[in-house]
UniProtKB/Swiss-Prot annotation:
Keyword Transmembrane belongs to the record: yes
Record's protein name: Cytochrome c oxidase subunit 6C
Organism taxonomic ancestry: Eukaryota, Metazoa, Chordata, Craniata, Vertebrata
Chief location bin: mitochondrion
Biological process (GO), any one: oxidative phosphorylation
Topology of this chain in the membrane: Single-pass membrane protein
Organism, as annotated: Saimiri sciureus (Common squirrel monkey)
This protein's pathway: Energy metabolism; oxidative phosphorylation
């Protein structure tokens, strides 16, 4: 058996290198989730509110609630 000299393992900077890689990954994932939320939830919600209030009439809504008897003090 020939005895071979094993290379010394790297012992310095392992945690720093691993954290650097994982921080970059976490940052990219968080950007992706933020973009998905913005374009998948926030923008459609904003559009739905804009469409609703484009044709909304508070007077008409008030009259419908008045006819339904929601307000006791108004006759």
């Amino acid at each position: 058996m020939a005895s071979e000299v094993l290379a010394k393992p790297q012992m310095r900077g392992l945690l720093a290198r691993r954290l650097r890689i994982h921080m970059v990954g976490a940052f990219l994932i968080s950007l992706g989730v933020a973009a998905l939320y913005k374009f998948g939830v926030a923008e459609p919600r904003k559009k739905a509110y804009a469409d609703f209030y484009k044709n909304y009439s508070p007077e008409k809504d008030f009259e419908e609630m008045k006819k339904a008897g929601v307000f006791r003090s108004i006759k």
